Amino acid sequence: MATTPAPRLLLIDNYDSFTYNLVQAFLVLGAEVLVRRNDEIDVAGALALAPTHLCISPGPGTPRDAGVSMRMIEAFAGRVPVFGVCLGQQALVEVCGGRVVRNSRLMHGKTSLVEHDGRGGYAGLWSPLEVGRYHSLVAE
């Protein structure tokens, strides 16, 4: 019986201490994780790695300060699933034509209930699910 190969995830590290928390989570899920800093790889080098998934990490500054992050999203969008966390999510918003602006209501250390259908990333989780929020920006 043939087995499905492990996802080959390229994680662009935007110099953030949270990056290796993401690496650990993806490893637990069975992915092969390739980490490259945002100034140590170009799009051609990333394509040569043949990832099946792309993740853009958190980091300081704005998406325009994040090295190759936005170029990676442009190159891989539509080819492989692309996931962004914090700064990575902001980069996704900007590449897709949106804007990231300050929220009129800060959500630092606040909790909220999320109701979901139990599919995808929510599989096996309670609904409603109490989640922690820590953000001061929103996408328009």
Describe every region a protein language model picked out:
Residues 1-78:
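N-terminal beta1-alpha1 cap of cysteine-dependent amidohydrolase-like domains
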Residues 51-124, 128-130:
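Cysteine-nucleophile active-site neighborhood
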Residues 37, 102, 133:
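Short loop/edge segments at beta-strand edges and connector loops
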Residues 12, 85, 134:
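Single, functionally critical "micro-switch" positions that shape active/binding sites
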Residues 20-21, 44, 90, 94, ...:
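Alpha-helical elements of the RecA-like P-loop NTPase motor core of helicases
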